[in-house]
């Protein structure tokens, strides 16, 4: 499970086995037993959320938007796909 970064105790990561065929670019977020998955394109939106409150969800979206380039580079480096 490649961890892209950690911020405020949240782990932003993806899994090495992201489906066959592989799912589109996305990020998983985890903290204290709560998790969510966000699609990165065409805009940052939740695929699912299992317990984060509305304020935390807004903060997560902002972080993912701000660091989308880093997430995308890490994804492509890991899977060997072109950007």
For the regions a protein language model found, what residue spans apply to each?
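C-terminal structural segments of small proteins and small subunits
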Residues: 53-83
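A short, structured beta-strand/loop element
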Residues: 15-54
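A generic short-segment signal for beta-strand/edge and adjacent turn/coil regions
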Residues: 5-9, 32, 73
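Short, charged/polar N-terminal "headpieces" of proteins
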Residues: 1-23
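Intrinsically disordered, low-complexity sequence elements enriched in Ser/Thr/Gly/Pro
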Residues: 4, 35, 65-66
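A broad, low-specificity signal for short, low-complexity segments enriched in glycine/proline
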Residues: 1-2, 24, 33, 75-76
